[in-house]
Amino acid sequence: MSKEVNEERTPRTVEDVKEMLTKHSNGEIQRTIQNCITILQNDHVLADAIRLNLLSERIDIVKPVGWPRSGKTLNDTDMKYILRRMEKYGISSEKKIESAIRIVANENRYHPIRDYLNSLKWDGTERIPHVLYHFLGAAEDEYTCEAMKIFLLGAIKRVFQPGCKFETMLCLVGGQGAGKSTFFRLLAVKDEWFSDDLRRLDDDNVYRKLQGHWIIEMSEMIATANAKSIEEIKSFLSKQKETYKVPYETHPADRLRQCVFAGTTNRQDFLPRDRTGNRRFIPIPVDAELAEVHILDDETESRTYIGQLWAEAMTIYNRGDYKLAFSPAMQETLQAHQQDFMQEDAQAGMIYAFLEDYTGDRVCSKQLYAEALGNTNIPAEWETRSICEIMNTGISRGDIQGWQAHKTAKRYPKYGVQKGWERVTSPETGAEDFSEITDAEAKQLGFPF
C-alpha cells in the first residue's frame, strides 16, 4: 500500500531534487524511469499531486499544480505541463515520463467514495425507514424500509467489495416532477458519481458509461422493454464485471462492477409480464403530494439528510448483520407489489379462461395454441415454449388449479405425441384417446420442457 500522501514534506527546490537523482560518470542526469519517479515524488509542484482513482480507474491530479485546469482527471494538457516541468531536470522522454506517472499514481491510489463513507459519523437518528416518505411520499412500511436498506447496503458493498453479487434494481414509480431522478442524483452524493446516460445496452461503449459512477439511473428502460430486451436487462443486471481495455492498455482487463442500478418510471404498468420472475426489480410507488418536503426545497438540507442516511447504512454494513435480499415472508410482499405494476398478459388470460370451460382431461401446448389462442398455423418453438411457461408457472403459483404436468409424453389424436398437462384427479373416460410413449421417444422428439 502507498505511503500517506498527506504526510508533511519539506519543500524541495529543483536543485535539491537533482541531488537525489542518479547520474552518469560525467555528472549528467540519467534519463531513467526511476529518476522520473523520484522527481514526481519530490518536486515541490508535482509531489503528492498524482494519484490513481480506484473508482474511475483513471489518474487524477488532486492538488493545485500551478496551471489552469478543470476537473481532476489527468488530461493531455496536463501532460504537456508535466513534460515542461520535467525538462528542468534534463529529462524529455515522454514514454518514460508516462511510465513513471502510472507507477507513482498506482503507489498513491485512493477511492473517493470509500474515503467519503469512512469519514461519516452517524448521529443515531434512523432515516432509512423514513427517507422515501420524507422526500417522495412513499409508504412508511416494512417493505419500503427493507427495499431501501437493501439498495443502500448493496451500493456500499459494491464499493468496498467490487464485483460482489448484487442484481437488485430499486424502481421508483410515480408522476413526473415527483423528484425521482433528483433523489437518485443526490443519493449519489456527488453529481460525478451519478449517471443517467445509459440508454441502450447494445451500445459498444455501454460498459465505459459505468466507469467512475456509483448510482446509474435507467429511466423508463424497463417500461419500454419487450420480451427479448427484458431478458437482456436481467442479464445485464446480473453481471459482476466487464472486460475491456482502455486506450493506453495493450490487453483487456476485468473491471469489477462498483455501481448499482436504479429505475424510474411514470408508468404504472412498467413491469413486463415475466413468467420466470421479476425478482430483480423492486417497485416503490411514490406520491409527491404526500412527501414531507420536496428534495429541492432546500438542497443543502437534503444533502445533509442523505449524508446521515449513508452514515446509518455504514453502521449497519460495519456490523455485518444484514442480507442483500428480502426474507421469504417479505418476498411474498414483493411479488404482490410486482403484480400491481405488471403489464397485462393477454395470452395467459386466454389460456386460463379456456381451461375454466374445458371439459377434457388433458391438454398440450399445440392444442392450447390452436384452441385457446385461436391460431391456425403451426406454432414456432418459442411459441410453444411460451405456452409451457404460462402453464407451468400458473400451476406453481396456484393460478391454475387442478392440473399437473404429464410425467411422460402422450399421443394426442390431432396433435401427435406431446408432453402436456392432465387433471390431478381425472376420470377414466376418454383415456382411450391417448397413449403413453417412452422417455426415449420423448427425448428424440425434443419437447420444449
Regions found by a protein language model. Give the residues of each.
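Conserved AAA+/SF3 P-loop NTPase catalytic/coupling segment centered on the Walker-B
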Residues: 215-237, 272-277
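Conserved catalytic/switch belt of AAA+ P-loop NTPases
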Residues: 230-253
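DNA transaction DNA-binding modules
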Residues: 324-449
